[in-house]
UniProtKB/Swiss-Prot annotation:
It is a peripheral membrane protein. The complex is composed of two ATP-binding proteins (OppD and OppF), two transmembrane proteins (OppB and OppC) and a solute-binding protein (OppA). The gene is oppF. InterPro entries: AAA+_ATPase (IPR003593), ABC_transp_ATP-bind (IPR050319), ABC_transporter-like_ATP-bd (IPR003439), ABC_transporter-like_CS (IPR017871), Oligopep_ABC_C (IPR013563), P-loop_NTPase (IPR027417). It is found in: Cell membrane. This is Oligopeptide transport ATP-binding protein OppF. Keywords: ATP-binding, Cell membrane, Membrane, Nucleotide-binding, Peptide transport, Protein transport, Translocase, Transport.
Amino acid sequence: METKKQKQNPLVNVKALSMLFKVRGSFFKALDEIDFTVNEGDFFGVIGESGSGKSTTGKCLIRLNIPSGGKVEIANHLISGKKLTRENDHWLKQNVQMVFQDPYSSLNPTKNVLTVISEPLVITKTVYGEVKEYLKTLAKLSFKTKKELLREDFELETQFYEKFFSKVLFHLETTINKFALLQESNNNSSAELAQTILGHTDDLIEALRQEFGLVYEFSSSQSEPLQKALKDKQETLAQDTIDKLKQELYTTQQKAKVSTQAFATWQKLQQTKQNLKAYRAQMAEELQNKPRIYLNAWLLTTKNYIKDSRQNTQLTDDVFAFSYNDMVDKKRRLVLVLSEYYKALPYFYDNWIHQNADRFDELTNAVFFDLIDVVIALNRDFANVESDAKAELIRFVQFIRRLCDLRFAALKKSFKKQTNYSFDFNRETELLYANSCYDIKELPQVIQPYWEKLFSDANYDKIAKSVQELNDIISTDIEKASNIASEINTKISSFKTEIAELKATFKTEKKAEDHSAQITGLKTQIAEIQTQIKQQKREVQSTEKAALKPVLKQYKSALHLYKRFKQLLRQFTKQLNLLVKKQQELEKIEEGLDLTIWERIQLLFYPVEGDLKSELKTRLKSFGVINFEYKRAVRESRVFRLVHFGHDVMKWGLFLPLTKIFMRNKVYEALDSVGLKREHAYRYPHEFSGGQRQRIAIARALITKPKLIIADELISALDVSIQAQVINILKDLAKKHNLTVLFIAHDLSMVQTVCNRLIIMHRGKIVERGSTDEIFAHPVHPYTRSLIKASPKLSKINIDLASFDEKFTYDSDYSLTNMPSFLKVPNTQEHELYCTQGQFDSWIKGASRIN
């Protein structure tokens, strides 16, 4: 793997991301609470077999799939939840792009490459802002600068005509002379003549194609004179000076209405009102809007977990599994109950939800832990008891499930009754219910140990302690929210008091002062500057008019080159038609030597259409391309000229044509960055190879300058040599533009080569994560080891490949009483496994290096 300095600034933060798909009335869990972080500049790998959840993860990040739960943050923008804010939605479209395995997923076969690549710019409207700034900048230029720009614009177009058409005319004249020699020669057969004609035509077309770069260079240099003028700021009287004086005049006129002290007080009053408005908006965003978005995302996650547990309850006919899933459902519903207090808080921070979510899950789990643990134990022991006792165990399981319902209902009812949002746990209610169901003196022997465990003082003390911890968290949050509300109200009150005092002061100081002399002076100064500008315009106009005459003369003479081009093109066509006719006549003569008289007569009236015309027809289309490119370049030159030197109203009328030019130039830059030619912009996707189409898809993703690119099996359908080219392009672009890449792939060798960190996914979960070097050097998880063993290598060419083991049972023992977690592998920096402690000890001990 390529060594790369790690940047520790997190760009993507994924927490408990879940994705449920509804399939024929039931839910399929594609992602199951996955957590990972991608740092800025990472080439982050995601690997796993088909159906492991790799692509679903990428689609959730870009919201092609709306996550069912969890939190997704990209550059501090919340992307998860049912709906996005308008700001986050616009940011996501501009800064996160995805490239798919099949390029046609993002390429429309009915549109040319220029239209396809520019689509993200149209959606995000980023170019519109650039064009507006461009037009605003033009308004700041002085009259002298504009006239100089006009002269430079004509010079630029003249240079284009002279460079481009002088070379084109040379190639045309050379070819016409060659055709003239062929017309005079009689030593060639029809086949030789046809081959020579095609050869000369191909040479001409190839020579003309070599000159296309001048057209593209001219198109992209239209705004260069303006950029140069902005860099070399000329010290001439511009509109900015008048605008500043007018602003000063307006301020002085306002001062003339009141006294100097009153005017200062009025300014302070307006500033205080703005500060109050900004403070309220800031508090509403930070302590109300943003936290409630996170709250809704958390509740959505919990509700989808409830859907999942209810589905599991409905799909099973096993009493133990039914009871277990029903208890899990109650535990998750209790989380929804306690979340009600958030809705009553006037203000709270989003990190309260982050800090409390996991703790709430642990404590609600502890509240029902004893019941769930007993059900799991009963299920484990059920097969070992005698048949007479099994009925008692089933009855006892049903009793525990009803006891769980009773505990949940009691906690929910107590929480609803309390005005301060707290739970009230009473063991007496459960003991009374238990005594009504069973006679303690005649308790069946088979349930005796479970009974003692459930109704012991130690067990109820644990439950009471967990409930009290929940109450403490809630009361602490309510107290903190109350303090925040008090601080905010105090701050707002101080603003209002200050505003009232300033209003009173303003009334007492309102008496006006005499500013007539200052106002008159400013008006005189403005009039003098306007007079100077008019005088300067007259001087510049006469000077520039003289300087522009030779430029226009040279420009007009350059225009004759295009007329000469059209004349030579007609001459070329005439010569070509004569040669084609000569070749056909030679062909008829050669064919007619062996024909009968009747066949010769038929050939005169029904001549055979030769292949030469059809061959030339496709080649001569290139002249249409030259004409198209020329007219487009000249048309755009006219647009820039009108924008630079036309009336202000006319400039905004040319907003859309100018936008199209800006978009096209950005498309050219994107094509250049992926190693394609600018002329490819006018072709269609079906005219390219698979590797070229993938490059176009990458260019489309890069055009908005995103922070994150999701490469979903980018190279899986490409040849090995093309894979290397595409990956090298992506690596170079990532380094050049500081891109972060989420690289989803099957090819382990490619992931090992290009990625610096990775995660391994199986059945919607992350089973192993860390640095690429550490994982490939010492894979531990059985699934990871099976993937690596099944991966072909040239070093193992004489060894049979290991078959991939699909029957993994490592997750069969996971439950609420035996929860897996991420455990760090010894002697590593960030290598972690998702497993229980028992599995961790066993796998670490048995894991050996894979050669």
